Amino acid sequence: MNVRRVESISAQLEEASSTGGFLYAQNSTKRSIKERLMKLLPCSAAKTSSPAIQNSVEDELEMATVRHRPEALELLEAQSKFTKKELQILYRGFKNECPSGVVNEETFKEIYSQFFPQGDSTTYAHFLFNAFDTDHNGAVSFEDFIKGLSILLRGTVQEKLNWAFNLYDINKDGYITKEEMLDIMKAIYDMMGKCTYPVLKEDAPRQHVETFFQKMDKNKDGVVTIDEFIESCQKDENIMRSMQLFENVI
C-alpha cells in the first residue's frame, strides 16, 4: 500500500473519530472502489478489445462448467446502471474467478485479504460479504455482485446511504445499535493493522461510536433508524466528508 495513501487513511480515521462520520463521501472519487472490485475480475480490463468479448452472455450460460445461471442479460441491464457490453465483460471476469457462478464467504475473505495484507480483514470481509449477499443464502451470485457494484459505482447518494446502512445493520432488523457500529469499527481498525500513522488510540473505535450516536440517534432510544441515518448524513458536511474512508476499505 502506498505510504501517502496510508497516511491519508490514517488522517481520515482520526477525523471520523471526531466527527461521527465513516460511511460514504458525497463527492469522493470512485476509483478506489472500482480498482478493488475489479481485482476480483482480473480478466475484465485485459480483454476489452478481444473478439471473444462480443459473444453473448447467453452463449456463455450453455457451458457445462457454470452451475449457477444468472438472470437474463436484459433484466440485469434494467436493474443496474451497466450497459450490455459492460455486463458481458463483468460476467466473463466473474466466471473466470468463480466457475460455479457464485462466491462463498471463505473465497470472498481470501480475495479481500489480498487488499489489506498488513492487517486482519477477516471480520470486515464477513460484514461486507453479508452486505452483498442480499438474499442471505450464504453465497454472492453474479446478480448480487452486479446490483451492489452498480450502487457503489454509479448509485445516487440516497442509494449509497441505504447500502451503507445495510452494511452497519448487522442483524438486518432495520436498526443500527451501538454494538453493531462498534463491531464494524473494530473490524476496520483490525483490517488497517499497523499501517496507520500516527498510531490510533486503543479506544478510538468506541469514542467514534459514541460520537456517531450523539449525532444520529435523534430520539435517544439507543438505536439509529434508516431515516435518522440518512437525514443526519445529508445534513452534516463533516459526516459526509469523513465518509470517504468507506471507499478506501470497500
From Swiss-Prot:
Known tissue expression: Predominantly expressed in brain.
Membrane disposition: Peripheral membrane protein
Keyword Membrane set for record: yes
GO cellular component, one term: voltage-gated potassium channel complex
Binding site for Ca(2+) 2: D169, N171, D173, Y175, E180
Sites of Phosphoserine modification: S17, S56
GO MF: calcium ion binding; potassium channel activity; potassium channel regulator activity
List of residues binding Ca(2+) 3: D217, N219, D221, E228
Subunit structure, interactors included: Component of heteromultimeric potassium channels. Identified in potassium channel complexes containing KCND1, KCND2, KCND3, KCNIP1, KCNIP2, KCNIP3, KCNIP4, DPP6 and DPP10. Interacts with KCND2. Interacts with KCND3. Interacts with the C-terminus of PSEN2 and probably PSEN1.
Free-text comment on this protein's domains from its UniProt entry: The KIS (K-channel inactivation suppressor) domain is required for converting A-type Kv4 current to a slowly inactivating delayed rectifier potassium current.
Family recorded in the similarity comment: Belongs to the recoverin family.
Protein name: Kv channel-interacting protein 4
Gene designation: KCNIP4
